[in-house]
Amino acid sequence: MAAAVRMNIQMLLEAADYLERREREAEHGYASMLPYNNKDRDALKRRNKSKKNNSSSRSTHNEMEKNRRAHLRLCLEKLKGLVPLGPESSRHTTLSLLTKAKLHIKKLEDCDRKAVHQIDQLQREQRHLKRQLEKLGIERIRMDSIGSTVSSERSDSDREEIDVDVESTDYLTGDLDWSSSSVSDSDERGSMQSLGSDEGYSSTSIKRIKLQDSHKACLGL
C-alpha cells in the first residue's frame, strides 16, 4: 500500500516537473520532449554516448587513414630513389614501381648469395694457406736445427784437420831438414869428386903433352 502511494507521488512529481518545463519552454518559444522515465532516460544517454563514440572513432579512423596514405607516399618516393627505373621514372605507376622493386630485390638476393659463397670459399683458402704456413714454419725450424748441427760438426772436423795438418807439417819439417843435410853432403861429395876428376884430367893432359914433346925431340934427333 505504502509502495503504491510512493509511486503515485513520484508520478505526480514528474508530471509537475513536466508541466513546469513546458511552461518555461513555451515562454522561450520552443517545445520540449515528452517526459521519460528512468529507463528511457538511461537508454537515451547510452544512445547519445554511442553516437559520440562513433563520431570520435570515425574521426580517429579518418586521421589514421590520412597518416597511412601520407606514409605510403613517402615510402614510394624513397623506393623510386632505390630502384633503377630508367629515364622515364616519373611515368611509372605504383604497380610498375612495385614490380621493378621486386625484381631488383631478387637480383640483390642473388648477388648476396654469390657473395656469401665467395666469402666462404676465400675463408677456406685462407685456412688452408694458414695451415701450409704453419707447416713451412715447422719445417724451417727443423732445417735450421739440422743446419746448425751440421755446421757444428763441420767446425769440429775442421779443427781436427787443422791439428792433423800441424802435426804433419812438423813431421815434414824434420824430413826436410834431414834431406837438406843429405843433399848438402852429397853436393860436397860431388864437388870433391868433380874436383878430383878435374885434377886427374889436368895431370893426364900434362903427361900427354910431355910425351908429345919428347917424341918430337926424338924425331929431331
From Swiss-Prot:
InterPro entries membership: bHLH_dom, HLH_DNA-bd_sf, MXD1_bHLHzip
The answer to whether UniProt assigns keyword Transport to this entry is no
Q: Which GO terms describe its molecular function?
A: DNA-binding transcription factor activity, RNA polymerase II-specific; DNA-binding transcription repressor activity, RNA polymerase II-specific; protein dimerization activity; RNA polymerase II cis-regulatory region sequence-specific DNA binding
Q: Where is this region: Disordered?
A: 30-68, 173-204
**GO CC annotations, alphabetized:** chromatin; cytosol; Mad-Max complex; mitochondrion; nucleoplasm; nucleus
What does the UniProt keyword field contain? DNA-binding, Nucleus, Repressor, Transcription, Transcription regulation, Ubl conjugation
Annotated Gene3D superfamilies: Helix-loop-helix DNA-binding domain
Keyword hit for Protein biosynthesis:
no
Q: Which CDD domains match?
A: bHLHzip_Mad1 (cd18931)
Q: Which GO terms describe its biological process?
A: negative regulation of transcription by RNA polymerase II; regulation of transcription by RNA polymerase II
Q: Which PANTHER family match?
A: MAX DIMERIZATION PROTEIN 1 (PTHR11969:SF18), MAX DIMERIZATION, MAD (PTHR11969)
Protein name as annotated: Max dimerization protein 1
